[in-house]
Amino acid sequence: MRPARSLLALILTALFVTTLAAPAQAGHNPPTATVVPLGRPLSDVLLIGGTVAPGPNGKTAIWNVSSGTPAYLNAIDPATGDSLLSAPLPGGDGSYAVAAAPDGTIYAGTYYNGHLYRLRPGATTVDDLGQPLPGETFILRITLDEQGNVYGGTYPHGKVFRYDHATGAVRDYGTIKAGQGYVKSIDYWNGKLYTGSEPDAYFSEVDVDTGTVTEIPPPPGMGDPKDQVVYDLNVRGGRMYTRVSTAFPGPLYVWDIASRTWVDTIPNEHGLDISPIGADGGIYLIQASELKKYDPATKTLTGTGLTFTGRIQNARSIGYADLNLPDYPGTSVVGTLWRGEEFRYNPQTGKSEIFQTKVRREPIQILAVAGGKNSIYAGGFLNGGVSVVNPDTGEAKFNRFSQVEALLEASDGTVYVGAYPEARLYSYDPAKTWSSPEYSPGPPGTPDNPKQLLNLKPDIFQTRARALVEVDGKIAVGTVPDGDRLGGALVIYDPATGAAEKYRNVVQDESVYGLTTRCGIVFGGTSIAGGLVTTPPTRSAGTVFAWNVAAKQKLWETVPVPGAATVSSVTIGPDGLLWGVAGKTVFALSPDNGKLKRSFTLGTTTSSGDIVATSEAVYVSIDLKKIYRIAPGSKSVPTLFVEHAHSRLGVRGDHELLMTNGPDLFRIDISR
């Protein structure tokens, strides 16, 4: 970590420490909250959408959008890896959708605002063209026709639009396949659009003039389309190449448009794009961890010797460029990987390499935060990563990793990490060298640290390890299901033996969002939500449940707040009651039988908050802008303790709360 970070944290601490006094309660001195900024512990590069096209200097550049707040449209010199241009996309957080028009104009479609942006040749700032389809918050992929009109696939209503580059007029082609909320992939060819869907794998052909939708039959061997995803799709030379998988390798099916038949299947293809057809008629793609050339005429693959390692190996852009380098004469294959690396290969010399470009690192939203004996742990959303933070100075050691859903320092000092996707559980020893072969390997021979302990997708179909708690030396994991499913799980992992007890649908059709424990009993808060926001629930309210770990049975479950969809967090208070939060309501239950003891409506929204406890009080996040303190006692009432925008609330010991707001981390000192 650069020394500048700790220096910055110290300066911020000196300038911006805020002291707040909570309202006094009768007979007590009011506790004081001192909010201390600790900086931004997580930053990295995440590239999703990209293309290879003319750059700002007229020469071929690699274009990618780096995720952040805001996201940036970047042009990279493929010969040097230098940044040629970095233009913010105001309001956009990232992009799966980047494409170039025939005249060199670059377009990008973003999430979570669903806007379309345009960068004209020679410009250094983008034009925000707005949300083409009101209510569609993701533009998942875009493509262009010969005239430069832009077509895009959207979420949450699975629509396709056309943006007329000359007039700005937008045509709404409507939902392409009923019941499919995502047009996950799209490409244009000869007056037709070819699309693929999610959560189920359907293929469609759309006539751009008439809007007529024709369904394409599934390829042989694909099986049931349910819970499969048409993750990417490219049309090259009259054939549609489409991968049915996830971010990981899967079959690439080849559909011949003229004969309307499936003509080939390429196994273990990584996506996210394949190259245009080269001068020799070949197409370059990443298959089985190697850059290979595919010959459409003979349906053969030829290796290049350029291999890839790590968990994520797909191309975030791929094309051709003249590099004018000694080992790279003529035209070379160039592209980018998800963490900002460039790969390149020269067909004449066989020379290849992978190196880090100079794309800017962006701060990462903190998704998980936990206090430890000597450190604070922060885990990142989307870009991912785990940072170990000095609680006094804010100095952070960043480690590149997966998206982190939950963190826990156990009593023996081991840090457990709940990851997305595949609801993976890892153990990390902070005293040893970090080495993740999937994301950030250490020196050769370094043992894996963190170590993967569980992957809960293959057998019980889970995707998010969202909650962690230690119970009698074991680790309880609460999860959210994968894909268009309902029904999370409670998993009890024993570090001593490596055994795991897995209880799917511990509460029927509900996901497990929060966990706490007392005396060998695990208590959980659940949500009616499933794996996708489009998954229709079967129940009307979140629950709280109790599970006896030794007896391996559920003791009770209850609905504490009728109509509240999610009980997002639970904790045991200093009064021995089981406290929880469901949207705007905080409540206390008897841990023995789940009987409601206390309830307070404090907020105005249904935003999910956290609830934590010290030996003196319970602290609860309401409306993501207020933190209330509830002292023990049947007559005590919640008092406003801190008013500050935030996203997560944690605790470290008895006198520190932890608060996050986007990428920013704060320590809240509790004193009297």
Where are each of the predicted segments found?
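Conserved beta-propeller blade signature
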Residues: 61-64, 105-108, 149-152, 192-195, ...
